[in-house]
Swiss-Prot record:
This is Zorya protein ZorB. Residues 87-225 form the OmpA-like domain. It is a single-pass membrane protein. Belongs to the MotB family. The lineage of its organism: Bacteria, Pseudomonadati, Pseudomonadota, Gammaproteobacteria, Enterobacterales. GO terms for cellular component: plasma membrane. Signal peptide: none annotated. Keywords: Antiviral defense, Cell inner membrane, Cell membrane, Membrane, Transmembrane, Transmembrane helix. The chain crosses the membrane at residues 25-44.
Amino acid sequence: MDKIIGKQLPKKDQDNEHWVSMSDLMAGLMMVFMFISIAYMHYVRIEKEKIKEVAVAYENAQLQIYNALDIEFAKDLQDWDAEIDKQTLEVRFKSPDVLFGLGSTELKPKFKLILDDFFPRYLKVLDNYQEHITEVRIEGHTSTDWTGTTNPDIAYFNNMALSQGRTRAVLQYVYDIKNIATHQQWVKSKFAAVGYSSAHPILDKTGKEDPNRSRRVTFKVVTNAELQIRKIIQE
């Protein structure tokens, strides 16, 4: 009879065969998960390396732009009462008495003379780094004060309109400088006039606002490093 229907394995042997099959299955799954983990870690490492490369390139470009600006304008900064921020790539004009009249958006004659000298040379420096530049912002900043009111909200929005009007006036003035005509298209595509009101005051050593230093105009280069990193993440 055993030869006809086959010999049935004892229950103990059946259980052993079952566990061997299960252990083989689990081992196979573990191998699959291990390969997935290795592949994912490899992918993450590659992405980190890409981001690191962009960060290094950003730092190099940032330093190169700063050095080029510093070499170009080092001898003029004191006369202009200006400074260049290495971290933000801002050329900061700090003397409000030279820039505009109180509550006015009209550029003072001395500021116009400074811009006549500064802006064509500024564009010449940036020419060498166009591939790294996303935007150039002309930023206007005010103090928190506003003559005629103690209401901080009214002062804020009045200063917002003032700072926006001033940066627009600066952009329009430099755009019309005769010897930058060949750069006008690039200026239109990259430059923005931004008024921040009193949102970014300059503080003194005690942590209080320095109203005089808070009133300023800056030219700020924004590089494309952040955009490149965002593209890597999205991919």
